[in-house]
């Protein structure tokens, strides 16, 4: 999953941090990073792009820069990922370049919805803009604590191989989470909670965990609130969500916290 990353950059502090994070991921199996810029005014001679390229060079990772002129950033990113043979797209959730916005919510969402590859979406705090490199270098490892949200539908079986890949890549701790929906079940529905616990344990038992600590966790209520609360409690460094379409799993979205 991590072997060949496509990292779209708009040269904002956010995309600089994403590229720096990619440079730290060699231990997770990253072998090559392709820096991709689709902004019209950029070229390989841009000093900021060169600085990011140099940082990747210091990491020892194989890397290169691809620049293109494109009007639709989401389509450009997806086409570039396919053309470069990427195994994952790693991008900042939002950012503002020196000329115009590139990564906005709609772009990130479009990439997630349409990508057949896993997407690593990283959102960095605004206060990190003053020292983007220092912020990333002092942050915990991406796979230190992974929260995996499972809806326990038929699509879950397609998601578990991605979880195994995270474990194999060096995840220290993985928490398998299911939220029992308050709109469909009662908190006193013992039968439902027993069924959920059984299914989570089945998925946990099939993982080859090695040195990784794998826990299961069940919450009750609405998905968004409980995922965020669980991430806070587990001190999650990464949240893994399945993305679905027409009842089958198309890929996985990884969101760094």
Regions found by a protein language model. Name each.
Residues 1-17, 24, 88, 110-159, ...:
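Intrinsically disordered or low-complexity boundary/linker segments at protein termini
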Residues 4, 31-34, 62, 144-145, ...:
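Residues at the starts of beta-strands that form the adenosine-phosphate
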Residues 18, 45-46, 102, 131-132, ...:
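Short, well-ordered secondary-structure micro-motifs
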Residues 19, 23, 27, 78, ...:
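A structural alpha-helix within SAM-dependent methyltransferase catalytic domains
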Residues 40-41, 54, 58-89, 94-97, ...:
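Structural beta-alpha unit
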Residues 81-134, 231-257:
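Gly/Ser-rich helix-loop-strand patches that form or flank binding pockets
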């Amino acid at each position: 999953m991590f072997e060949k990353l496509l990292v779209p950059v708009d040269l904002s502090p956010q995309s600089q941090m994403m590229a720096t994070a990619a440079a730290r991921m060699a231990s997770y199996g990253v072998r090559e990073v392709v820096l991709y810029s689709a902004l019209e005014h950029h070229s390989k001679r841009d000093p900021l792009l060169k600085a990011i390229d140099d940082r990747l060079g210091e990491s020892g990772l194989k890397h290169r820069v691809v620049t293109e002129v494109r009007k639709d950033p989401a389509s450009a990113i997806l086409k570039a990922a396919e053309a470069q043979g990427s195994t994952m797209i790693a991008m900042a959730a939002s950012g503002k370049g020196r000329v115009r916005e590139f990564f906005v919510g709609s772009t990130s969402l479009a990439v997630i919805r349409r990508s057949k590859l896993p997407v690593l979406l990283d959102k960095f705090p605004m206060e990190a803009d003053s020292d983007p490199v220092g912020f990333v270098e002092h942050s915990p490892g991406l796979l230190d604590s992974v929260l995996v949200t499972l809806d326990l539908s038929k699509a879950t079986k397609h998601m578990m191989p991605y979880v195994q890949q995270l474990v194999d890549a060096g995840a220290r701790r993985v928490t398998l989470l299911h939220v029992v929906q308050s709109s469909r079940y009662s908190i006193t529905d013992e039968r439902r909670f027993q069924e959920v616990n059984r299914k989570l344990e089945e998925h946990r038992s099939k993982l080859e965990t090695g040195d990784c600590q794998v826990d299961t966790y069940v919450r009750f209520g609405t998905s968004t609130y409980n995922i965020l609360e669980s991430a806070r409690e587990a001190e999650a460094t990464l949240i893994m969500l399945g993305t679905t379409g027409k009842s089958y799993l198309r890929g996985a979205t990884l969101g760094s916290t």
